[in-house]
Amino acid sequence: MPDTLNKSVAIVGGGPAGLMAAEVLSNAGVQVDVFDAMPSFGRKFLLAGIGGLNITHSEEYTKFCTRYADRQPNLQTTLDLLPPAQLCEWVHGLGIETFVGTSGRVFP
């Protein structure tokens, strides 16, 4: 295992992507500092939730992937890295409960 304990990373931006990067790096043993111009992190994510932000869809994975139409071949590898079920597990690991709406969308 590489020596990550002496490594540190500064992430500029406390939005969803910055926070996800911080979590991945921190779990790998890297010291992470997150900087944002706003006084609190994840504000856009929280505001999107007020409007009914869904995080994924509950349908069968193969069908889910077809929703990306012509872009599916380019996105498949990325989708396979974090399929909907695994995304829900990650959200639950953050202590956030989810529910499936009548449309099949998964909401926090």
Locate the predicted segments by residue.
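Beta1/beta-strand and adjacent pyrophosphate-binding region of the FAD-binding site
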Residues: 2-17, 33
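Glycine-rich FAD pyrophosphate-binding loop
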Residues: 10, 26-50
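Flexible, glycine-rich phosphate/dinucleotide-binding loops
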Residues: 18, 41, 62
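Glycine-rich active-site loop/strand segments that organize a redox cofactor
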Residues: 52-103
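P-loop NTPase switch module centered on the Walker A-proximal segment
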Residues: 105-108
